[in-house]
Curated annotation (Swiss-Prot):
Zn(2+) binds at H112, H114, H356, D441. Its EC number is 3.5.4.4. Changing G47R: In VAIHS; there is a decreased expression of the mutant protein compared to wild-type. PANTHER family: ADENOSINE DEAMINASE, ADENOSINE DEAMINASE 2. It comes from Homo sapiens (Human). The gene is ADA2. Homodimer. Interacts with adenosine receptors. Binds heparin. GO terms for biological process: adenosine catabolic process; inosine biosynthetic process. Changing C137G: Abolishes secretion. Candidate gene for the Cat Eye Syndrome (CES), a developmental disorder associated with the duplication of a 2 Mb region of 22q11.2. Duplication usually takes in the form of a surpernumerary bisatellited isodicentric chromosome, resulting in four copies of the region (represents an inv dup(22)(q11)). CES is characterized clinically by the combination of coloboma of the iris and anal atresia with fistula, downslanting palpebral fissures, preauricular tags and/or pits, frequent occurrence of heart and renal malformations, and normal or near-normal mental development. This is Adenosine deaminase 2. Residues 1-29 form the signal peptide. The lineage of its organism: Eukaryota, Metazoa, Chordata, Craniata, Vertebrata.
């Protein structure tokens, strides 16, 4: 309606008066509608439908008092760990009273872990590299390699002369400084990550170089056994009672040079876990998700899938399924491997998949569509699923199928998918209660340990001010629900977790 002549002015005045009267007349209904929408959002949030008992309500009140105080202080100072790079925020996180409570909390299971990134690198340096017969050499690119051998390994074109570390340490002036240099080569940690890691390809290159560097240490048979045991110990100390580990099952070697195959490795995982449970009876155990690298040809992946099928038949209680690992942006898409990935179905063999999918910022590409293909290939869980919120139809499909995403916030930040974790896309999914679990990917590579640091980032940053004890409880229970344990094992696990949870609640509520 045009209102620019004298005759139209009374009509305009009448319209404005009507709007004003409507606004003031409905002020109460606006408040009611606002309250209704806020309540609806509260119920939709992850854990929003959980009903807390009296002790849990008290514990929640105390936890939220601490959380709100820390967040208000952060809003005043603009120093907020989840908005900072983890390498620069870690020392601040460790001062947090909320973090100390999260460390106490029984977290259930860690369902997204990689085999040689889960034990603190300090242990590799201070313990493993001090063991007898440990040698070091350098590739033409200056990358470290390690090998245990007696006598000294023969030189090769791929590496410089092998040096016994015991002898080398006797020659260096400052052993502590040398060990610190080893530690720097075993992690991504740096004081200036934004300068050192200018883009995703740079950080991924260093990331995969670390795997290459430490592989010779971890895959020495005596170390391998100790490493598996220590991984369970470190997560157990962080109140995690079950682990599912992506493992490439690379050859494990003896001092003599003898090599063991994949079956030996799976059996060793099984035996070491049984040994750990003997002294930690509440620990549920571990399972392996056999994995191969997505840079390989289709024919190689087809053989790996057949290997996974065979291992799962021989070790049904240990081998959970199969996954593809590596940098999604530069590797093959799931669609590229479609024929190989269909082998189990064609052979009438059940091989569960746990695909990394959507660990990318490139929307609308074949990389991004891995999310869709993972679901079409009947994945059990989605590793990372960083891109899921950009695909509403796929998101709805995964929700209806009750297929969770495995969220690893620190990994996503360090590998440069997101800088400020308040802006992590999973915040939208948390707000609507999408199925998810929290895990830590390769915590040792990031200078972290266990699961608590990732829980902190989720609770304080991604979940915002409204994430509370209900959120934490739901995430812990989800980790049991979405594990690959049998229903009877899940029930046992839930009973053990519930006892620990009740004790945790009592401690928080009374101290």
């Amino acid at each position: 309606m045009l209102v620019d002549g004298p005759s139209e002015r009374p009509a305009l005045c009448f319209l404005l008066l009507a709007v004003a009267m409507s606004f003031f007349g409905s002020a109460l209904s606006i408040d009611e509608t606002r309250a209704h929408l806020l309540l609806k959002e509260k119920m939709m949030r992850l854990g929003g439908r959980l009903v807390l008992n009296t002790k849990e309500e008290l514990a929640n009140e105390r936890l939220m008092t601490l959380k709100i105080a820390e967040m208000k202080e952060a809003m005043r100072t603009l120093i907020f760990p989840p908005s900072m790079h983890f390498f620069q925020a870690k020392h601040l996180i460790e001062r947090s009273q909320v973090f100390n409570i999260l460390r106490m909390m029984p977290k259930g299971a860690a369902l997204h872990l990689h085999d040689i990134g889960i034990v603190t690198m300090d242990w590799l340096v201070r313990n493993v590299t001090y063991r007898p017969h440990c040698h070091i050499c350098f590739t033409p690119r200056g990358i470290m390699q390690f090998r245990f051998a007696h006598p000294t390994p023969r030189p090769s074109e791929k590496c410089s002369k092998w040096i016994l570390l015991e002898d080398y340490r006797k020659r260096v002036q400052n052993v502590t400084e040398f060990d610190d240099s080893l530690l720097r080569n075993f992690t991504l940690v740096t004081q200036h990550p934004e300068v050192i890691y200018t883009n995703q390809n740079v950080v991924w290159s260093k990331f995969e170089t670390i795997f290459f560097t430490i592989s010779g240490l971890i895959h020495y048979a005596p170390v391998f056994r100790d490493y598996v045991f220590r991984s369970m110990q470190e997560f157990y100390e962080d109140n995690v009672l079950y682990m599912e580990i992506r493992a490439r099952l690379l050859p494990v070697y003896e001092l003599s040079g003898e090599h063991h195959d994949e079956e030996w490795s799976v059996k060793t995982y099984q035996e070491v876990a049984q040994k750990f449970v003997e002294t930690h009876p509440e620990f549920i155990g571990i399972k392996i998700i056999y994995s191969d690298h997505r840079s390989k040809d289709v024919a190689v992946i087809a053989e790996s899938i057949r290997m996974a099928m065979g291992l799962r038949i021989k070790f049904p209680t240990v081998v959970a399924g199969f996954d593809l690992v590596g940098h999604e942006d530069t590797g093959h898409s799931l669609h590229d491997y479609k024929e190989a990935l269909m082998i189990p179905a064609k052979d009438g063999v059940k091989l569960p998949y746990f695909f990394h999918a959507g660990e990318t910022d490139w929307q609308g590409t074949s990389i991004d569509r891995n999310i869709l293909d993972a679901l079409m290939l009947n994945t059990t869980r989605i590793g990372h699923g960083f891109a899921l919120s950009k695909h509403p139809a796929v998101r709805t499909y995964s929700w209806k199928k009750d297929i969770p995403i495995e969220v690893c916030p620190i990994s996503n930040q360090v590998l440069k998918l997101v800088s400020d974790l308040r802006n992590h896309p999973v915040a939208t999914l948390m707000a609507t209660g999408h199925p998810m679990v929290i895990s830590s990917d390769d915590p040792a590579m990031f200078g972290a340990k266990g699961l608590s640091y990732d829980f902190y980032e989720v609770f304080m940053g991604i979940g915002g001010m409204k994430a509370d004890l209900r959120t934490l409880k739901q995430l812990a229970m989800n980790s049991i629900k979405y594990s690959t344990l049998l229903e009877s094992e899940k029930n046992t696990f839930m009973e053990i977790w519930k006892k620990r949870w009740d004790k945790f609640i009592a401690d928080v509520a009374t101290k």
